Amino acid sequence: GVSSAAVSRYLNGGPLSEQKRAVIHEVVEKTGYRPDTAAQTLRTGKVNQVGVIAPSIGSQSVGQITAGIASELDAKSYLMLLGNTELDAQRELGYLTAMQRNHVAGIILLGSYYTPQLAQALKNCRVPVVVTGQRFQDVACVYNDDRTAARELAQRMLDHGRKRIVYIGGTERDDATGVQRREGVQDALNAAGLNGEQMPRICCNAFTMEEGQRCMQELLVRCPDLDGVVCVTDTVAFGAMRALREAGRHVGQDVGLAGVGDSWAGSMMEPGLATVRFYQKQVGQEAARILLQMLEENGS
């Protein structure tokens, strides 16, 4: 047998020999026992809940990031409280306030628009915060190199002889997808002796197939001789592909098409979509590890 103190250490992640840990683990699994988290909080003063604020839970990348976060939190017996903003800035601010009132130990904020109001709200947070997908000032961040990714996509097109490249981007309120990806494409064009700043481009209102199709139709009118299209996301590229086919253009032959995200659907299309992969699950895992380290250092 083992003592009640040993069981308590096991349930709370305390020091314990591997032999005792294995014995207790077997009993816990057989009985299906789960500790009362509210009682644990009252007894230890330690909050075991982390808030996660996401811009759109229907997004493939958001799903991958939250899966990574959950895997790390589960390993440390933390629960995840999820808030879905649907890109509503006021709802995002509301979640930041509400989660603190609900006594979360920390918050992970998935990339959003950086506004003075959000900057002030993050500054006023009473709990540790980690941001993913964006580079915000004065807060821990985990983000991808969007500029390099877009530059490499455009360079691939240039290497295949494309010279009249257009770009379907996103709102520049979003630095990562709106500014960094657009600048990456322009970098590649400038390096090739083309004028990146004069590149025909259009901003879609949402990362949807419908918007990709609409933007592509407009660019075909403006630039009928285009031979390459770089899109801000794969989903937007799928819509662009539809518009190109409707216009009688042959994707992969007379016009190149690329997107960002390495969506599973891209591999099923014929021809396949040129894309770049972001390891979003690892982004979520790293964000959770950073937050857990901050909580450990704070004694939370």
Question: Model-found features: residue ranges?
Answer:
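N-terminal helix-turn-helix DNA-binding module of bacterial transcription factors
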Residues: 1-48
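Generic recognition of short, well-ordered alpha-helical segments
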Residues: 19, 37, 63-65, 94, ...
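Bacterial carbohydrate/catabolite-sensing allosteric modules
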Residues: 30, 71-76, 100, 124-131, ...
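Short gly/ser/thr-rich secondary-structure transition/capping motifs
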Residues: 30-36, 90, 110-112, 213, ...
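Secondary-structure boundary/capping motif
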Residues: 16, 61-62, 91, 176-177, ...
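Alpha-helical recognition/docking segments in bacterial nutrient-uptake
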Residues: 22, 37, 45-155, 159, ...
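Short beta-strand segments enriched in small/hydrophobic residues
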Residues: 4-9, 43-58, 156, 164-171
